[in-house]
A protein has these predicted regions:
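Polar low-complexity intrinsically disordered regions
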Residues: 1-3, 58, 84, 102-103
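N-terminal short beta-loop-beta anion/metal-coordinating cradle
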Residues: 14-26, 83-92
Length: 129
């Protein structure tokens, strides 16, 4: 496996999960945790576009496991994930609290046709595909 690290990013492989972290963002590690998965042998798609065929239960289960593995690698709580249903729009929503209690906020109507999320809450972990 080729190391993709350079002057801007660090390529990390931890517990079988590969991800990138930006050196500049790491300067704010006291207030920000970030990771950009390489998606190598991983499936982070919890839904398909509204015009496409829905994903299978098995695909959804695999995506959830892959998100959980990534969260474990960066020492974050998988249940704190909030992920929009992207549709290549200009829509961005603010997230103030979780909708679900004991599972991530995936595929929720609240985030239909939303391509970005913002928050200032420390217990909300934002994700996209």
């Amino acid at each position: 496996m080729k190391d993709l690290s350079n002057e801007n990013v660090i390529h990390i492989v931890k517990d079988g999960v590969q991800y990138l972290q930006f050196r500049r963002l790491l300067e704010y590690s006291d207030i920000l945790v970030h990771a950009y998965s390489l998606g190598i042998d991983k499936n982070f798609r919890t839904a398909r576009a509204k015009t496409a065929e829905p994903i299978t239960k098995e695909e959804f289960k695999e995506a959830n496991k892959d998100y959980a593995d990534l969260c474990n690698a960066i020492e974050m709580n998988y249940i704190d994930l909030v992920k929009p249903n992207q549709a290549h729009t200009k829509n961005v929503k603010k997230v103030d609290e979780h909708v679900n209690i004991n599972k991530p906020d995936f595929n929720l109507k609240e985030y239909d046709l939303t391509d970005g999320l913002i928050t200032n809450k420390s217990n909300i972990l934002l994700a996209t595909t």
